[in-house]
Each structure stands twice: as structure tokens, then as C-alpha cells.
């Protein structure tokens, strides 16, 4: 994670974990904090929540907030599980974390107070959660899509879309795109009123990377197999006549 002049790196592992901030120009260690000796894989992220910038990371049976400038702990909450992969997401001053091994839990925390708002026994182990317009959308590892009210945790709907997922869902306009490990992309509406499938498309034979969007183009990295040969392929999808937005 890049924050101002810092590159913030997490290395949680059984040999002894740590969280560190490096000077982006020199690589010098600005601060370093020890973390539990547990393997977990979530990336840290900085949000302006609770009236200040907070560096938040999930895993090691906890969700912890640090001051990104100094590494000092702001708050810590017991929750999720040992191993988390998805990055924390936010809605206003609420932050959300989920983990799936060996236990499973999704938790909502008020970042201003460090207090738990709600929690459940559901999980998205590898894919990250997606927040849009006050609702959380989940496409879990086993291919079940869920919509929760972000403030209360109330389930709005649940739908099996099939497949196994490692890539995170992304929002494009008012649609959500999720691609499973076999390369099947499913598009459905980001609508708390109910699940509505918009389209499906097969792209390659394997997919583990999260799609990205830039300049009205959708980019997907997948793999194609031919016998024992495996070749990764990058797809760029968009209308040929669509206006390309130039980066400033």
C-alpha cells in the first residue's frame, strides 16, 4: 500500500510477522511493528475514517488499525479468523473484514470507536467484499453471491451462481462482474432488491486474477490450456467506438 511518501508492507507468517513502512525514495525503514507469528495474506489499506487516516489490516484472529504515519496502534478487535486474504472495505466510518480459515466470520467495525457493530458466521475467504451504495456484496469461494445491508448486516438475498472463486468481484456502472476459476465471467446487477443475472461469458480455461477497468475498457487475465501446455492471456473488452478516457 502506498501512503504519501511511504510504501507499507505486511508480512504475516509463522516465522514471525511484521508490518512496516518504507521510504518510497530510499527504501529505508521508517517504522516497523511486530505481528503474531501466523500465516495470513490480506493486504493493508489506508482509509480516512473516524476523523483520521487509519491503516487497517485483518488476519491473525484480529482486525487492527494503525496510524500510517507512525505505526502506533489505534484500536484492535478480536474477530474474523487466523487466515484472511481479502482486503478490508468501508462504508462511511464502518469497515468490514472477512476470513475463512480455519474458522469463518464477517465483521463490521465502527472505525471511530473500534467497536463491533455486527458480525456473522459467513465468509469470503479469498475474494474481497464489495461495497456499493450502502450494501455489501459477496461472491464467496464456493460460488454463492450474497447481499447484506452494510449498516445492519441483514441479508437481502442469496444466490448460487456456481463455480469456485479466487478473483474478487468488481463494480462496473451498476453491474457486478465476477469471474470464477474456470474462466466463466458472470455479470449481475448491484441491486439489493434481488439477484438478476445480466450476462455470462467464458474466457479461457482458468482465472484467478481480479479484473480491472481503465478508460472504458475491461481487462481480464486468464489462462488457456492445450494438453500439458498452459498459456496466460490478457483480454481487453470494450466497444470499438467507445471513447477512450485519457489519463491526466
Question: How does the language model describe each region?
Answer:
Residues 1-248:
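Noncatalytic, solvent-exposed loop/strand surfaces
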Amino acid at each position: 500500500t502506498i501512503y504519501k511518501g511511504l510504501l507499507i508492507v505486511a508480512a504475516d507468517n509463522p516465522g514471525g510477522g511484521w508490518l512496516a513502512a518504507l521510504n518510497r525514495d530510499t527504501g529505508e525503514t521508517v517504522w516497523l511493528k511486530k505481528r503474531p507469528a501466523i500465516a495470513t495474506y490480506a493486504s493493508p489499506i489506508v482509509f480516512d475514517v473516524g476523523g483520521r487516516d487509519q491503516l487497517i489490516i485483518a488476519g491473525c484472529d484480529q482486525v487492527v488499525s494503525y496510524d500510517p504515519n507512525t505505526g502506533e496502534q489505534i484500536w484492535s478487535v478480536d474477530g474474523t479468523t487466523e487466515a484472511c486474504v481479502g482486503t478490508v472495505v468501508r462504508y462511511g466510518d464502518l469497515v468490514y473484514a472477512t476470513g475463512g480459515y480455519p474458522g469463518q466470520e464477517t465483521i463490521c467495525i465502527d472505525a471511530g470507536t473500534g467497536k463491533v457493530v455486527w458480525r456473522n458466521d459467513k465468509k469470503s475467504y479469498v475474494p474481497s467484499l464489495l461495497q456499493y451504495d450502502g450494501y455489501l456484496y459477496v461472491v464467496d469461494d464456493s460460488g454463492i453471491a450474497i447481499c447484506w445491508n452494510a449498516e445492519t448486516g441483514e441479508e437481502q438475498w442469496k444466490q448460487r451462481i456456481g463455480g469456485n472463486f479466487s478473483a474478487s468481484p468488481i463494480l462496473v456502472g451498476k453491474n457486478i462482474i465476477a469471474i470464477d476459476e474456470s474462466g466463466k465471467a458472470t455479470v449481475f446487477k448491484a441491486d439489493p432488491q434481488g439477484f438478476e443475472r445480466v450476462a455470462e461469458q467464458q474466457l479461457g480455461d482458468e482465472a484467478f486474477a481480479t479484473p480491472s477497468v481503465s478508460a472504458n475498457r475491461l481487462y481480464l487475465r486468464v489462462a488457456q490450456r492445450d494438453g500439458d501446455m498452459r498459456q496466460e492471456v490478457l483480454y481487453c473488452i470494450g466497444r470499438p467506438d467507445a471513447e477512450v478516457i485519457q489519463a491526466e
